């Protein structure tokens, strides 16, 4: 049984037409042309792109209802931001325990980019994700009983 969904900067629709798609289409890390290319690698069939597994924003409340608690994290400067936030709203409307957090000043995938590892947004992403896993899964996480200095040291060792 899945106890928690933890999507980071999720793809939730194949329409490519949200305000964040328009605003960040050419000027940030993930561009609209790259996103369209990635969709083409999956399928070029418009019908398949509308299927719920590809575009969960198109799911009905009945299809969404019963999903596990969901903690969505999005980047402010990301073409996927609006659909991630819309997914959080849709899940909540369907009765799912859903939380969406927007991290200001960062781009798509920032939490996985070594050059951005020192940002406070990256640290918040990692620690809040770990805290949610501990809460829903009952597991220990790196920050549970450690000081900021210990976490910084561990982060440096990891890379």
Regions found by a protein language model. Name each.
Residues 1-159:
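Alpha/beta-hydrolase superfamily serine-hydrolase fold, recognizing
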């Amino acid at each position: 049984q899945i106890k928690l969904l933890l999507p980071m900067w999720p793809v939730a629709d194949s329409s490519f037409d949200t305000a964040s798609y328009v605003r960040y289409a050419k000027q940030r890390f993930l561009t609209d042309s790259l996103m369209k290319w990635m969709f083409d690698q999956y399928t070029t069939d418009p019908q398949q792109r509308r299927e719920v597994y590809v575009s969960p924003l198109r799911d009905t409340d009945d299809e969404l209802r019963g999903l596990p608690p969901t903690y969505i994290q999005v980047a402010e400067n990301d073409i996927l931001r609006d659909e991630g936030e819309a997914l959080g709203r849709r899940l909540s409307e369907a009765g799912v325990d859903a939380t969406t957090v927007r991290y200001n000043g960062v781009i798509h995938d920032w939490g996985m980019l070594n050059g951005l590892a020192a940002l406070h947004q990256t640290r918040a992403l990692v620690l809040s994700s770990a805290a949610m896993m501990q809460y829903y899964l009952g597991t220990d996480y790196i920050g549970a009983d450690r000081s900021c200095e210990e976490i910084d040291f561990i982060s440096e060792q990891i890379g």
